[in-house]
Structures are given as structure tokens and as C-alpha cells.
Amino acid sequence: MTSLLDLLAVPPALLALGEPTHGESAFLQIRNETFMSLAVQGYRSIALESDRAAGLIANEFVQGSTAVTLDRALTEGFSHGFGGAPANRDLLLRMREWNAGRPASERLTFHGFDAPLEIEGAPSPRPYLIRTCEFLGLDRSTEIDDLIGDEARWSDTAAIWEPGRSIGRSADAQRLRVIADELLIELYLNAPRLAEGWPAAFVQAMSAVAVLRYHAAAAAPLEREERFARLAGVRDALMAENLLQIRSAEAHRGPTLVFAHNTHLQRQSSTMTMAGKDVSWAGAGAIVASLLNDRYAVIVGSLGASPALGIGAPARSTYEGRLQRGSMLPRYVRAAEIPAAERRTHDHRYFPLDQATIDHADAVLHIPTGVDAAMLADRILALPGVEQIVPNEENGSPEGASGDRFFYVGPDRRQPFATIVDHDVPGFDDASQLDRPGVFRLNLDLGRAEFERLFGFPPKAFEEHRQEFDFARLDTVVPHPGYALYGFGSIVMPGPHLLPEIDRLLAIAHGRAVDRHERAARRAADQPD
């Protein structure tokens, strides 16, 4: 792909990369490649659409802490369920690997920039206030607990739509806002003696402020449509505040990449029609762009098709359809080079491009298609003479192979040249963690020569090198954890940017299968009747 920075007129301090939907892994996988490439060019931090306070745990892992395991970093270090995305696992591991042995000035930092809330509700501020008090050595837990009262008052999702049920403007909530403000002052007063750990404590205090602000907004007596826009706007304002604070903290180390949904990063206001009424609000990107000017750049994400989400190919007359014409590989395109086109039909699964989004963007990342197991199977079946067997009870296959796909050339079914699997075999083949939702693996018969060219050692030496590989990492050609001895390699969830390499390796594996079939045919022809 074209280098991202080459498309920008001015090198930004905050580079935003958007996705039009949550759920298409290809955007996260390309984000990972982009960030690691930017790290080589001086970027030192990444901020994701995830709870900023929770992100402190993920960053502990990234910094090499032995107190935070990878599992904990993923379960507690992300909000919105994003820790379950396989690409986010890879991001944390790659950042930790980069940081190993590097000085502070070159280390990568992980940030969340969302507030600890969802659009439909927010928690109580208690844990954030208590953690701030503990850092300061203050005991205000009794006072805070009395004001919090029943946690159910804060977690009532109906309060988002019924202001009379919200606790946000009660006397207790008002007093808690005063306490949060007092704790912020105490943090600054005590900064000289508590410099170590101060930034994390500040994040905890600001998280308390954020949820209290959101609860107050939920208590405003507004009509339903205005209410939604107000709450969405408050959330984006909190995101913008976090981004500006993150940039202030990171300014001396290098630029920051921020990754989120397009609607949070675009320069123009967000709009929505609810019950026939148009509502709008300034997103985080609109706020930050107005304050940072050309120090902020935004690349919006564009999606052609997504097998995983059930989104088909776009019409040729749409923005996405026209972007498909130049290449079926992911690419960055200057926004100014994209001609006018039709807006794709609205689909609740993702946000299509429109002229306003393009006009306010610096560039577009277009992904023509995501990749799933069925799409790869079709690619393999398009090769000459290929047949597929999917094991099941009807054809007498063993239970452990049910649902896998085996690809052969000719009638010999003893050795497939490629397989696609989506589940572990406990005790034998579980290093790829294929039991994660949506995860699959492509396995290919590379042969000894290609195997050695890729990995630097012959198949017979695999066990000596096993510990060098992370078999669960996406987008990486590795020896097959179970069949490397026979020259097999594998790739977990290859993204669309790897399709050319997949085609190259498929050609090798398919060619080997064709040769075997032709040799067998010649031997059969030489046999006497």
C-alpha cells in the first residue's frame, strides 16, 4: 500500500484512522501493520476507542509488567468487548515486544480515549474516586459510599431515556462532583511528592468527573431526539478532552495514532434522523480538529464487502464501488482524488461514505473485502482440478475434523495440499487458539524448499525452533504447529493485504499437488493390466 504519511500535506501530531463499522477485523489488522510501520518513523503512542482508565491495565502489559498477564490485559484493559478482538491481542503483544530493551523515549504507549461508559448508560463514579483517594492517602470512603448509595441508582439504563429516573442532578450527585473536583486539586497540590503514578491517578480522577458529567446530562429534561444528540455529544466531548490530554502527555515523545469509528474522528458534525427529526452534534474529531488545526489529520475507513458481516459487494456507481475499480487490495487514497459518486444504501451494519465525509477527510483507507474461511475456500477451488471435502458424520470423518475443509488435486485423498480449520484439537493442535470466535487458519503444503526459504531452517529442525513462534498471531506465515515436520505452514486469519502472498503460496502448494497427481497417473499407466 501507499505510505500513509506520503498522502498528508503536513505531518500531524495526531493522526486519526477510522473504520466504518465495528466487527470487520481487516481494519484492525491493517491498523496494527500501520502503527508498527509508523513506530519506525517516530510514532510513540496509539489511542483506541476504549475506556481510558481500563487502558492503564493494557498499557502495564505493554510496558512489560509481570503483574499483568495478557489475559488480564485483554479482559480488563478494554471496554465495549474489544478485548475479544484477536487483532487487539496482537497489538498488545507487538507493542510489548517492541518495548523490550528500549529506552523510555523509544517505547510505545497504549491509551484508551473513551470515557468509562456506553451511550445507553454509565456506572457510578465510586471506583474512580476511591482509587484517587487511595493514591493521595485520603480516607473518604465512608462519605463517598453514603453518597453513592445503591449502585442500582447509577446503572439504571432506563434513566437514559427518562430524565426523571436519572440520579445525575440529585444532591448526592452534585456533592460527588464537588468531591471529584477537590480530588483533582489535591492531585495537583501533591504532584511534587507523588510524581510517580500521578498520571494514572489523574486518569482515575478524570474518569470520575466524566461519568458524573454524563449522568448530569442524562438528567436534563429534553425530548427524546434532542436527548440522544446531547448524550452522544457529551460522550464525544469527553473523548476529545481525553485525546487532547493524551497529546499533551505524548508531545515530547512523538506523534500519536488514534483509531476509532469514523463518526468519532471525522471533522464534520455527526447527524442522524430520529422519528423524522434531524439531530446533530460535534464528534471528538470535529472538536479536536478545530483546536489542533493542521496538527490533526483524519483517514476515514471505507468498506467494499465483508463476508463476516454479511455485507455484499457495492454497486459500481457508489463511492465504494468506484474505489473497487482500481484494485482489489486495501489502499490509501487522497480524499481529493475521489470523484463524486452515489451514496450506498443505508445499512445499519456500517456507515457508507458520503461526499461530506470525503470533503472533510485527508485520505480514505478502502478495504475492498474482508476475508473469511468461505472466501479463501472459493479462492482455492478456483485453481485447476481442485476438489474440496468437508468432513461430517455422513462421510464417516472423525468427530474432531467436523467442519474443516480439505483440498485435493485428483482422486488421491491421502494428502491435502491445503486445509482450512476453525477449531483446536486439544493436546495436539491448540497453539493457534482457534476456539476464539471467528478465528480460522489456512494450512498449506509448502514443501521443504519454500519452508526453509521462509523460516531459515528445514522442516526436520522445527522442534528446535518452536519457541520462536507465536502460533496464535494473525497475518503471519508460521510453521504449522502440528505438521511442520512435513513442510506445512499456516496463517491465522489472514487479512486482505496478504492475498497476494497467499496466492503465491497457494500456487506452490497446488503445484506440488498437481505434480503428485501426475506422477501417480504415470505410475498407474505403467502398470500392466
Where are these regions (language model features)?
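Structured catalytic-domain cores with a bias toward divalent-metal coordination
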Residues: 1-374
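Charge-dense, helix-prone N-terminal extensions
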Residues: 372-529
